[in-house]
A protein has these predicted regions:
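Active-site and adjacent substrate-binding regions of carbohydrate-active enzymes
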Residues: 1-224
Length: 224
């Protein structure tokens, strides 16, 4: 018996890390937070690629360290996929960042810029992206509409991605502003008096009458 399963991922081992694609050169953590909340609210099971929860940017791998045959063949026009495949930084204080024994050379080089983003460093900060992901995952487990509900997109908006999740008569409107300026979203009539469903450790929106105002890289959920 086969069962269809829908996975939602922001990164994988063949594309530039979401920390660089969506976070930009300055690794905009606010943008990465709204991306994380977006992923957790989509229909399907969220699938995290190692390092997404840390906000790791794409690593710069020197030609002599490449392992990807595509990168080796097409350098420098295409630098390959090794930039998203470097070791996970577990311990920012260890010589090998907690990856391996420290006595053997890893398949790909460790990235020094990752030390400050290592698990050991982010665990110390309750407001870190890692702890935000942990809180989101725990919160999502208690939201049956997000776990099992259908999904319907709202009309296209230049700044906001919005959709409605529905399960057993319960509905959640999910709205995410992916732009660097505030945005206004016109609400469907049934959600104009809905209750705000708090996202743990995140927010960035208000409701006034028939519209929702979202801050830069803000997110907001309304529940019926």
């Amino acid at each position: 018996e086969f069962r269809r399963v829908l996975f939602r991922s922001l990164s994988n081992h063949d594309v530039v890390r979401v920390g660089s694609r969506w976070g930009g050169e300055t690794a905009n953590v606010r943008k990465l937070r709204v991306a994380a909340a977006f992923q957790m609210c989509l229909r399907g099971s969220p699938c995290l690629y190692q390092g997404d929860e840390l906000g790791l940017p794409e690593a710069q791998v020197a030609f002599e360290d490449l392992q990807d045959p595509y990168g080796i063949t097409m350098w420098p026009e295409f630098k390959g996929r090794d930039g998203c495949r470097t070791p996970m930084p577990w311990d920012g204080q260890a010589a090998d960042m907690g990856f391996g024994s420290g006595t053997q050379k890893p398949w790909l080089p460790l990235t020094e810029a990752y030390r400050a983003l290592a698990v050991s460093e982010q665990e110390k900060d309750p407001q870190s992206l890692l702890n935000f992901y942990r809180d989101l995952l725990a919160w999502r487990k208690g939201q049956s509409v997000l776990l099992h509900g259908d999904q319907a997109l709202l009309p296209a908006h230049k700044q906001v991605m919005a959709f409605v999740r529905e399960h057993e008569g319960n509905k959640i409107l999910c709205a995410f502003n992916f732009s660097d300026s505030a945005a206004t979203l016109n609400l469907p009539a049934e959600f104009q008096s809905a209750s705000v469903l708090p996202i743990p450790g995140w927010g960035g929106g208000t409701v006034s009458g028939d519209s929702m105002q979202l801050e830069t890289y803000g997110a907001m959920l309304l529940a019926l």
